[in-house]
């Protein structure tokens, strides 16, 4: 148990130490200030603007900014869909992989354009190097940049006074990719290659096993095919951009994607680095660092509590394991805990931490099988996604989602004291409240409607590997992952079917773009308003009371929306295990 506590403390410490300077750096990028990379990258930036005829002086209204986001995303979706369909005719396909089905192409295109990276396939057997590089990796960069750009627009809405424009989308996305995502990805890629993660264009290699394996049917296996490819470059941005889609089917549990404890540390820190840094960017750029720290603390408290619950439940295992003597918490030499579905080289503490990080952020990469966790250990990752991916969340979208909850919190506080609510010096009026509700409720709507329909269809029910409460949890987790733009899975049922591909694709689109449009509408409304001077009745939004209120509002909406569904799934399974 002490190992658990020490690892948790180390991960959080490293994150904060790296995130604070990165947050300041990102703040400079948002404002167009010079940074240490400016001499190298400014000529590249200006060349891109010139080549694409981008007007650097244009300041977009929220409607034009929204139109640009949607137009860019639609074009990205169409291009990625066509790459999947025609990959058999495209270069860099040494394994001669044919094109995917239209429904899988639609699902995967939506998945990567929305920064979800839900995968109903194994990358090493279904996709060519070209599709992985020019399709998925490109979207890993730009979908992350879209989320950060929308956050930039929202911050400008609060800091600008009596204006109409919230920034230039084309400049925001260009600067985000060029100055933030590419430099960080180069560093992480090189670190991963140093640990043995593959980065090449070779054909898959067939190697002889050290020891033959005899299968159940008597077949003796003496060789194994080792998948290769440009993995390190994709893995770096899949973590940094909170994308999560694995180069291999088993994601970061695969020894080629994540071979060592050190590579695991690099990938895990990369996972939450930018979402944590953006909290400090927020405080810096609104010129009140206390606001960013308050949101960071609120998110951090929920993250640490979730880490503790998952870690303890996995270390304690199930009642059945305790009866068999597999778990003994009374001695310093921990006997095991629930190691099912976990890599022996990582163990319970590291696997539990990753499960917390990946579902707190809208990442979805895994280094263990969440379906094999204990009922409560598996419920907490599900709940983190159901809260709206606001416990740090995805790059950009996590913070603007939490700001939506902050608006709800100050509105509730305003009702209690009979004052017009204010946030960051701007009045919160009916329009902002409507948009904030839209931002906060889009995820529950997408999850509950999708999982409800899927759970009553014979096609889905008949494909479940597990019946009862756990089978329902597998379906609920799938649509929770889609609605939370996460991408991880319990698996356990046939996911690559036309209905699942289309329904999950629609859930991902709804949960991505409805909150995004609501956020931009809030930015467009706020940017026109004047600042209101603080008074005795103004609710401070940087103290302990507000942090507690914000956590309460997030948990209240999550609990009210999902408790009935969780009661039918993981909670019911927990009580079944108690016997």
Curated annotation (Swiss-Prot):
Molecular function, one GO term: P-type potassium transmembrane transporter activity
Q: Does the keyword Cell membrane apply?
A: yes
Q: Does the keyword Cell division apply?
A: no
Any stretches that span the bilayer, and where are they? 2-22, 66-86, 135-155, 177-197, 262-282, 292-312, 391-411, 437-457, 490-510, 546-566
Q: Where in the cell is it found?
A: Cell membrane
Grouped into one coarse class, the protein's main location is membrane
Q: Which InterPro entries match?
A: KdpA
Q: How the protein sits in the membrane?
A: Multi-pass membrane protein
HAMAP family attached here? KdpA
Identify the PANTHER family for this entry: POTASSIUM-TRANSPORTING ATPASE A CHAIN (PTHR30607), POTASSIUM-TRANSPORTING ATPASE POTASSIUM-BINDING SUBUNIT (PTHR30607:SF2)
Q: What does it do?
A: Part of the high-affinity ATP-driven potassium transport (or Kdp) system, which catalyzes the hydrolysis of ATP coupled with the electrogenic transport of potassium into the cytoplasm. This subunit binds the extracellular potassium ions and delivers the ions to the membrane domain of KdpB through an intramembrane tunnel.
Summarize subunit and interaction data from the UniProt record for this chain.
Answer: The system is composed of three essential subunits: KdpA, KdpB and KdpC.
Designated name of the protein = Potassium-transporting ATPase potassium-binding subunit
Q: What is the lineage of its organism?
A: Bacteria, Bacillati, Bacillota, Clostridia, Eubacteriales
């Amino acid at each position: 148990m002490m190992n658990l506590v020490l690892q948790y403390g180390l991960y959080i410490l490293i994150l904060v130490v790296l995130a604070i300077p990165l947050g300041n750096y990102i703040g400079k990028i948002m404002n167009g200030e010079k940074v240490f990379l400016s001499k190298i990258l400014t000529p590249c930036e200006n060349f891109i603007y010139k080549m694409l005829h981008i007007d650097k002086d244009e300041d977009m209204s929220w409607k034009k900014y929204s139109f640009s986001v949607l137009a860019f995303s639609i074009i990205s979706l169409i291009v990625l869909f066509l790459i999947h369909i025609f990959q058999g005719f495209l270069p860099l396909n040494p394994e001669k992989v044919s094109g995917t089905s239209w429904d899988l192409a639609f699902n995967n295109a939506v998945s990567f354009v929305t920064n979800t990276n839900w995968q109903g396939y194994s990358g090493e057997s279904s996709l060519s190097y070209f599709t992985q590089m020019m399709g998925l990796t490109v979207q890993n960069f730009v979908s992350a940049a879209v989320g950060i750009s929308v956050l930039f627009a929202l911050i400008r809405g609060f800091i600008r006074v009596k204006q109409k424009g919230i920034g230039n989308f084309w400049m925001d996305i260009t600067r985000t990719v060029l100055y933030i995502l590419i430099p960080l990805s180069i560093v992480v890629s090189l670190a991963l290659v140093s640990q043995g993660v593959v980065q090449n264009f070779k054909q898959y290699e067939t190697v002889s096993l050290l020891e033959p394996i005899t299968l159940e049917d008597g077949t003796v296996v003496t060789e194994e095919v080792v998948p290769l490819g440009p993995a390190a470059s994709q893995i770096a941005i899949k973590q940094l951009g909170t994308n999560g889609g694995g180069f291999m089917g088993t994601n970061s549990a695969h020894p080629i994607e994540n071979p060592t404890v050190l590579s695991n540390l690099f990938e895990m820190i990369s996972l939450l680095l930018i979402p944590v840094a953006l909290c400090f960017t927020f405080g810096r750029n609104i010129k009140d660092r206390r606001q960013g720290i308050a949101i960071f603390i609120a998110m951090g408290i929920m993250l640490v509590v979730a880490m503790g619950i998952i870690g303890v439940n996995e270390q304690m295992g199930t009642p059945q394991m305790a009866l068999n003597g597999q778990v003994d918490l009374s001695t310093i030499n921990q006997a095991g805990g629930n190691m099912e579905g976990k890599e022996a080289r990582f163990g319970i503490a590291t696997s539990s931490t990753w499960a917390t990080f990946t579902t707190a952020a809208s990442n979805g990469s895994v280094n263990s099988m969440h379906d094999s966790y204990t009922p409560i250990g598996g419920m907490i990752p599900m709940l983190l996604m159901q809260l709206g991916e606001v416990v740090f969340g995805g790059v950009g979208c996590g913070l603007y989602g939490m700001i939506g909850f902050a608006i709800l919190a100050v509105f509730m506080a305003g009702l209690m004291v009979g004052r017009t609510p204010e946030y960051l010096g701007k009045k919160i009026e009916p329009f902002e409240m409507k948009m904030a509700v839209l931002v906060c409720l889009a995820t529950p709507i997408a999850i509950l409607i999708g999982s409800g329909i899927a759970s009553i269809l014979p096609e889905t029910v008949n494909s479940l590997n597990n019946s009862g409460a756990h089978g329902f949890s597998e379906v609920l987790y799938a649509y929770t992952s889609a609605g939370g733009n996460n991408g991880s899975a319990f698996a356990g049922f046939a996911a690559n079917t036309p209905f699942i591909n289309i329904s999950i694709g629609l859930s991902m689109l709804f949960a991505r773009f409805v909150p995004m449009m609501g956020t931009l509408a809030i930015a467009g409304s706020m940017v026109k308003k004047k600042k209101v001077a603080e008074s005795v009745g103004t609710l401070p939004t940087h103290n302990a009371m507000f942090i507690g209120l914000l956590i309460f509002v997030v948990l209240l909406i999550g609990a009210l929306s999902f408790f009935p569904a969780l009661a039918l799934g993981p909670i019911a399974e927990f009580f079944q295990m108690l016997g």
